[in-house]
Amino acid sequence: FDRPCLSEEEASRGVIGIPRVLNMYEDYPFWHAFFTKLGFRVVLSPASNKEIYESGMDSISSDTACYPAKLVHGHIKWLVENDIKRIFYPSINYEVEEDKTAPNHYNCPIVATYPEVIDKNMADYFYDNMVEFYHPFVPYDDDSRFVREMTKFFNHERDIDLDSTRNILKTYDLEAGARDYGLFSMEISDKEITE
């Protein structure tokens, strides 16, 4: 998670916050590279702790959600309390297919759709704090659809077009994909094997 960020002067598009939660643990290397190349300074919420959990409790609508999902509320609140005005937390049904022999690469329904829960449960909080909460449905497992959807999503940013998004994705795949994602996955696998 310790990745170099653009300085405030270098960040031509400003700051974007990413919560350190659920599937963002695995996907963060990609999103950090993606937003950095677009010119955003990326701010990541800190590691989970009791204070973060308790700070978000007032917006948890269901006691039946799993503990990791409940943590999301506190991470979002931390970003808002640290004056982050744009937060990105996408809904992702399918992850990148890492193992061709696996029967699927589908996220559990809570992981896939929890950004929608956050949007509904924290809408007033976002409004009161003038925060833009970005939670698009992203086809993370299909490069061409990903490029199309992310370009549509960012159509409010003047010069983020299809080619820009495609080039960032291509650059990430070549430069960082094997290094960041592969090494990160290996670290996880190594920990699982040794523990």
Language model regions located:
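An N-terminal assembly and electron-transfer interface module characteristic of large anaerobic redox
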Residues: 1-195
